[in-house]
């Protein structure tokens, strides 16, 4: 019997089973113990293959692919710390709902806890963060193939959102020519190999329940809060709220067009908060809210009912309001709960939103970080997409810009870490094949610098704007101790990114004014390649401008 040949047949069943559940993208890191899985994926024509030498970046690449494709994405890594490097992407997927299938190769049980090389306790290492876990046995013909395929099918059928971790131990030898070992074992699956359906088909009901008292609540004074959702859902939510006459507070990721722009500015005005206190119901569609003032208002508002609608299960209201948690796709829920045409009940908030917008526009000519956030809608590629980093940049765009309704916006706002942002953006571009604008800070770019290797392979123009404010300037917005701020919070690195771009043979520009930036962008959008644009800005201007605008708008 050939161990290596049967390992490959076992792995081939696993990978083929994944194709029956919509898996098309497979992300592969180099490794020896994962050879059976890698070869099975490489030989399966149903897959699009992606490779990367860094498992942490690989996991985030898969995350980006899943965000756009809305299908599960498989990741293959070898044993040991390679597995641990998937942790941050797995956590993010658990919070934002993308489906990742983590296929982690492992040593067989007899090599665990005995000093064997590259052998760690992988089973259960991700604790409660995966949505599903599956620890497979060592490949053996004593276990029928139908058990293996039905086990994979069951795990995937139960995966509603987040990650499925499948730990796959393989004994040596891992290499060798294929022979007839295990062929009969494999053939017992019959015509399943030619079919396109799962071996085990499990129906899942995910239908929205209609709230029978909706006709009553839609006649009340309501507020709509729009969090993360798809571009199509964003347009529908905006129209729904407009018909109801309810004010819509749209997050940067809502894609609603933010009809009341600069919400994180005007929510700092007491007149706005007073008017919102008249709301009898708040309907929040989507989660992962960004704005600090929005979160503060959400935490203190006390409507009669607070509804949260999202297709991700679990509690999504950190303020723990009395109300309803409804698990449903946003578009489906809107269809079941039509709006009734009513006059807008808010008067003060539209006025404040307009005045806040005017204050922001008045500062747009200065070359700086806050002004870039405001201008970002002018730089979006036509029929393209935007990827927004974390920390200060996403807050500035949320507070100071007004993105077009229905324009695709992506980000990692689940755990909101700065790890893997460039890798995620690379996955977003690969899955969509669209022109992409990504914007991150300098520390975020440094944190995922080797992901520039992934950006050498793009199918449409990709522009990475690195806002270099020399450190983590978001801490300038927080009451960090002044004497300790620079060394222990901001951590300025005093670096530029021209050499990094050159290392990976990427185009590079460092504009010093708006005209130079617009010229660099015009050239970049004509070229199906990656262009790194570094904006070197004054360290504290972005945070200070936001604070100044907050003070101005609060006194309107």
Swiss-Prot record:
Cofactor names from the entry are: Mg(2+); Mn(2+); thiamine diphosphate
Per UniProt, the cofactor note for this protein states: Binds 1 thiamine pyrophosphate per subunit.
| Keywords for the protein's UniProt record, in alphabetical order | Magnesium, Manganese, Menaquinone biosynthesis, Metal-binding, Thiamine pyrophosphate, Transferase
Q: What class of enzyme is it?
A: transferase
Q: Which Gene3D superfamilies match?
A: 3.40.50.970, TPP-binding domain
List its EC numbers: 2.2.1.9
Q: Which GO terms describe its biological process?
A: menaquinone biosynthetic process
Q: Sorted alphabetically, which InterPro entries does this protein's record hold?
A: MenaQ_synth_MenD, MenD_middle, THDP-binding, Thiamin_PyroP_enz_TPP-bd_dom, TPP_enzyme_TPP-bd
Q: Which GO terms describe its molecular function?
A: 2-succinyl-5-enolpyruvyl-6-hydroxy-3-cyclohexene-1-carboxylic-acid synthase activity; magnesium ion binding; manganese ion binding; thiamine pyrophosphate binding
Q: Which domain of life is it from?
A: Bacteria
Q: In which pathway does it act?
A: Quinol/quinone metabolism; 1,4-dihydroxy-2-naphthoate biosynthesis; 1,4-dihydroxy-2-naphthoate from chorismate: step 2/7; Quinol/quinone metabolism; menaquinone biosynthesis
Q: List the disulfide bonds.
A: none
The record ties this protein, via Pfam families, to: TPP_enzyme_C (PF02775), TPP_enzyme_M_2 (PF16582), TPP_enzyme_N (PF02776)
Does the keyword field hold Isomerase? no
The answer to whether keyword Membrane applies is no
UniProt catalytic activity: isochorismate + 2-oxoglutarate + H(+) = 5-enolpyruvoyl-6-hydroxy-2-succinyl-cyclohex-3-ene-1-carboxylate + CO2
Q: Subunit composition?
A: Homodimer.
Q: Which NCBIfam families match?
A: menD
Record-stated family? Belongs to the TPP enzyme family. MenD subfamily.
* Summary of the function given for this chain in its UniProt record: Catalyzes the thiamine diphosphate-dependent decarboxylation of 2-oxoglutarate and the subsequent addition of the resulting succinic semialdehyde-thiamine pyrophosphate anion to isochorismate to yield 2-succinyl-5-enolpyruvyl-6-hydroxy-3-cyclohexene-1-carboxylate (SEPHCHC).
The name of this protein is 2-succinyl-5-enolpyruvyl-6-hydroxy-3-cyclohexene-1-carboxylate synthase
Provenance organism? Salmonella gallinarum (strain 287/91 / NCTC 13346)
